[in-house]
Amino acid sequence: MPLAFSDHNPSLTYARSENRGSGFGPSPRRLQPAHRPVPPVRRHARRRPITHCAQPITSGAEMIRALGLQKAREMIARRDVLVAGAAGGASLVLPGPGGAVALPKGTGAAPGAGAVGKFPVPTLDPTTIPKYVTNLVIPPVMPKARHSERHGIDTYVIGVRQFSQQVLPPTLPSTTLWGYGSLGDNSTFNYPSFTIEAKTDRPVRVTWVNDLVDSQGRFLPHLLAVDPTLHWANPPGGNAGRDSRPTFTSTPGPYTGPVPIVTHLHGGHSTEESDGYTEAWYLPRANNIPPGFATVGSFYDEFREKFDDAHGLKWAPGTATFQYANDQRASTLWFHDHTLGLTRLNVYAGPAGFYLLRGGECDLPKGALPGPAPAFGDAPGTRYHEIPLAVQDRSFNSDGSLFYPTSREFFDGFAGPYIPTTDVSPIWNPEFFANTMVVNGRTWPKLEVEPRRYRLRFLNGCNARFLILKIADSPTARPAQSAVPFWQIGNEGGFLPAPVRLERLLLANAERADVIVDFTGIPEGTELYLINEGADEPFGRGEPGVAFPVADPATTGQVMKFVVGPLVSKDTSVPPDRLRLPRIRPLGSASVTRRLSLTEANSSSPLVPPGTPVQNLLGTLDAAGNPVALAWADPVTENPRLNATETWELHNFTVDAHPIHIHEVAFEVVDRQPFNGSPIPPESWERGFKDTVIAYPGEITRVKARFDHPGRFVWHCHIVEHEDNEMMRPYQIGGRRKQDH
């Protein structure tokens, strides 16, 4: 029988079960060991029978139905992925699509006609980056705008700008990034953003400004290579062609700018015009926007008018103003860019930050949990015992610039032909796993802690990497023994029904975990390490080191270091095992059950190796239970009645786990059910409410939500490479729109 992780036993024992729901249960596939004499390394790409993109049934789905999940697992070969980087002094040669290339800092270069289009990118060997020499940066609080508290609303003016920051240790070059900051204070621009502190039932109004312009007011090019063959914002298409998948007569080079943005408050209970809808983007107010370019997305004007009608404020060009009612449970939220077809690149460039909602009946009284957290106006040197931790993976070039693939060849070695000769996009990679771990904008930082309790708010901000976090006394020993447990008290939707003791945290992309870590009694001078036992590849499930190779212990298997210092403050917080968490009001019964599908489409071209993935898709199921794959532009199929409570069944026909995020709602995880098995209750850390859930391969994941804001929203996979290439769908609450786009 397979082994499954049991979170109920503090000694980290394992329960034997055929149908256990944990992500540490049986793996959907067996992998060959990674061979990485020097990174980067390309393992064998997944090869499957050719399937047509328009076909509603993928080969993986057919195999699961015909053979059963376990047999399909054995027969479906895993694709390979590449961990970016190269040995010190070496160069990584990457091809440019159609002879046009994007240089590391976003400038364009076009070799002569007929040129191969390859150029050297010197990448930074992650093993040469010193670890634990830089102190962890604890994000300060974002300052409010002047006169911000008029009418009982906290107001902010926050822009996205380009700047240089020391992400790598000081002995190495700085990195050009994008990030949020208060337009009234240049010192607040940072990666990740300063934190927005909000109070339950007190509105927050933010004017989000696209300030990606230079000192002369000209638009800045993108830092990374943008693939214009996806279904994306497409400003060059003009108003008629925006938010579309363009057609080409020859393989295009990368789009470099101007760059559209739109900010989404992830986990917010938002109205449609303030949700950061992916087609409500806007360009900077630059003085050199090319003639004929669309300057806003398809929904921008409609939402601008709606916001004006509701709040008496019309958005200025290059901006959007959103208002958040904060009428939800105290919780850990975050904000990030959400532009159609560009999310993976815009967020990788830096724009993201925490939004912490406090107060109300669903919070704990002051002093019950470790504190303080950062507050506006804190004196320098203030010690914090509540700390948000944004964990991300990044790769770098030797000049300190960000590395992200500029060609599809990076993923699986397929060097073309690309669109339009085949259906393979020239730049987009199905997933990307970087080679360096970054916490709060610093590579492998260290934090001195007192021997007392700390409240840590974890966010998995990676593009594609699932994290399995553990606190160990060795940075490299695998398997690692837990040295200090986590007490998880909350997730995306606020506090759990009761604290849960865990030896490790499984966090999918965009998931959050609110935990208490108790360093009480640990001797001064002790060094402890936050390590990652997730994989350097797509996650399915299974025991680390058994079902899949753990992350490289020398690089991506290490996250940060804790050094226990002297006790200098009194800890009056309640021990986690004695905490009584706020009561949770469960949702009522559902009136509708929707059957939804998750699939992967492979290339249909005879010029492309069989099994080459070209899209990930959401959709529905037909009467026989077969997936009906739908693209972003297909008609809306999810249309809950206003104030209806519905159950959504996520049928995963792929061999990967997908973190599914539904905008506007906080949902309950009802259960999971293998395709040929019985329902399994949710994990203890998934109780209460969530906004992102792991849909495991070969299973039905059921969630239940109440849809109480009318309008247009989206649901999608939060592996952002998937999201950017069709694994996102619009949904409509409260009937049809007066007009569609």
Regions found by a protein language model. Name each.
Residues 3-5, 9, 14, 20, ...:
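N-terminal secretory signal peptides
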Residues 59-60, 64-73, 78, 83-91, ...:
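N-terminal, post-signal-peptide metal-ligating segments of extracellular/periplasmic oxidoreductases
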Residues 158, 206, 337, 389, ...:
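Divalent metal-coordination and catalytic microenvironments
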Residues 208-212, 460-462, 650-654:
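Asparagine-centered strand-capping/turn motif at beta-strand->loop junctions
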Residues 240-365, 497-562, 654-658, 683-741:
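Extracellular/periplasmic metallocenter environments
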Residues 270-287, 295, 391, 395, ...:
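Histidine- and aromatic-rich segments of cupredoxin/plastocyanin-like copper-binding domains
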Residues 473-493, 653-687, 720-723, 732-737:
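Active/binding-pocket-proximal capping segment
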Residues 595-669, 691-719:
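C-terminal substrate/ligand-recognition segments
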